[in-house]
Amino acid sequence: MSDHRLALVLLIGLPRSGDAMTRLLLVRHGRTEMNEWMSKPGKGWGAPGFVDPALWDTRLTPTGEMQARELNSQMRSWHPEVDLLLASPLRRALATAEIGFEGVRCQTQRIEPLAAERCFLSSDVGSPITELQRSFSPAWGFETLPERWWFQGDELTPEWRPPGTYVNPGEDSKTFYARMARLIEALRACAGEHETVALVAHWGVLNALTGRSFKNCEWSDQLVSDLPDTPFVAPD
């Protein structure tokens, strides 16, 4: 190795061989019932007198389904084959993945609970595995998760959310970003086995992985080696 090359390696580190080769498609889910509700005047996150509407594990709206079909057209054209398709176990991500990647050749697909959204609101509380098994393809491998797989919280969980009325515990930043660090490692572990990995997830998750704000059904195409060593942290 030349002195110049050695200096670069010592300065920035040498990417893992799998990281440098594996493409990573990051996708945010389509528009949901909670997205619609939060867009109303005075209903947004942190609004005075905020009250959670108790929309549990929200589904895609007709607009969200249309966005997922548009995603499908793009995937069929630009990425007609994906080695591994991962999705958060929340309904909006699973539905986006099933619509958005229909007809795309996927060697393997599975749910990735590390990619669930940070538990802000009722919409981020998951559905029992037995319910998901009735609604989505068995190819996801739901049997690998416990019945109640989502963040539970307890009376010791500190409240970090803006003043308001909530119907579920909020996932504190320490817990969430520790989970995001494990997700980064899990994605890197996939790199040596697959050429293209797709992950369908959520705003908070994708922001932690990239530092960017993703719109509904927006996606990015990058390398696993582009992932940060530690998650990007957004202010509460």
Language-model region placement:
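Bacterial N-terminal signal peptides that target proteins for export
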Residues: 1-6
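Conserved AMP-binding/adenylate-forming core of the ANL superfamily
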Residues: 60-65, 170-177
